[in-house]
Amino acid sequence: MDGKAPAAFVEPGEFNEVMKRLDQIDEKVEFVNSEVAQRIGKKVGRDIGILYGGVIGLLLFLIYVQISSMFM
């Protein structure tokens, strides 16, 4: 072997057909990846919302306890 990569000769029509099919497969893979990322984002957003709600609820409760203890 003289260090060169082997060359293959393909008809241009066949090559273009294969490239179109690869583009379609690539589009499908990108679509699925984006759907998965969107679902993960929704789950993370829900979890963050629950945490913020808990923290705000706890702060409101502590403020209520502080204020109610001042008037006793």
UniProtKB/Swiss-Prot annotation:
Q: Its domain of life?
A: Archaea
Instruction: Indicate where this protein is primarily found.
Output: membrane
InterPro entries in the record: THM_MeTrfase_su_G
Query: What keywords were assigned to this record?
Result: Cell membrane, Membrane, Methanogenesis, Methyltransferase, One-carbon metabolism, Transferase, Translocase, Transmembrane, Transmembrane helix
Per UniProt, subcellular location reads as: Cell membrane
Q: Name one GO cellular component term.
A: plasma membrane
**What does the entry give for GO biological process?**
methanogenesis, from carbon dioxide; methylation; one-carbon metabolic process
- Short name of one Pfam family for this protein? MtrG
The EC number(s) attached to this protein equal 7.2.1.4
List the protein's name: Tetrahydromethanopterin S-methyltransferase subunit G
Q: Which organism is it from?
A: Methanosarcina mazei (strain ATCC BAA-159 / DSM 3647 / Goe1 / Go1 / JCM 11833 / OCM 88) (Methanosarcina frisia)
